[in-house]
């Protein structure tokens, strides 16, 4: 049975080959159909890829814009944080410096009372009594003057400046007016009398000078 099939196949091969030689168009048509099928599949795949590509690009662009906005917001927060930190550092440094400068303010105010007493004691000594034939009073007076000079040197060393504005223009930040009075030959608004000297500590008024101010006519 198998041998018969083989003989039949061998017998039909020449006829099949002859039909192919006599009909080459069949081969070309089949090949074209095959190629066309492959091309259609490739075109469909490319079209599908082209359709997906714009969507992907759009998504990427949206993500890019979102990330850029987040980055911008983060940088702004970072800059604000840096500015706040710098402001805090400067304020803290200023507070420390002021504490160093003005920490002795209360102590200085107490010393001013001592300086006032020394000044009054010196002024109370009659100048006509300061003579060589009165050595005790002369020595006492000279001792008071030396002490007053020395305490003013200490004040200056620590930034404490004496204010004696006699004849100067009245300054409400440094002077306190006790009264106003017309004074002949004096410019209105100037200090005519200093009742009590004032003091400034590192440029800040520690105690205003108590003064009388010339009043305009």
From Swiss-Prot:
Pfam families linked: GrpE (PF01025)
Post-translational modification N6-acetyllysine, affected residues: 94, 100, 215
Main location: mitochondrion
Entries under CDD domains matching the protein: GrpE
Cell location: Mitochondrion matrix
Coiled-coil intervals: none
Keywords of this entry: Acetylation, Chaperone, Mitochondrion, Transit peptide
GO CC field: nucleoplasm; PAM complex, Tim23 associated import motor
Family as reported in the entry's similarity comment: Belongs to the GrpE family.
Description of how the protein assembles with itself and partners: Probable component of the PAM complex at least composed of a mitochondrial HSP70 protein, GRPEL1 or GRPEL2, TIMM44, TIMM16/PAM16 and TIMM14/DNAJC19. Binds to HSP70, HSC70 and HSJ1B.
Annotated function: Essential component of the PAM complex, a complex required for the translocation of transit peptide-containing proteins from the inner membrane into the mitochondrial matrix in an ATP-dependent manner. Seems to control the nucleotide-dependent binding of mitochondrial HSP70 to substrate proteins.
PANTHER family: GRPE PROTEIN, GRPE PROTEIN HOMOLOG 1, MITOCHONDRIAL
Protein name: GrpE protein homolog 1, mitochondrial
Organism: Bos taurus (Bovine)
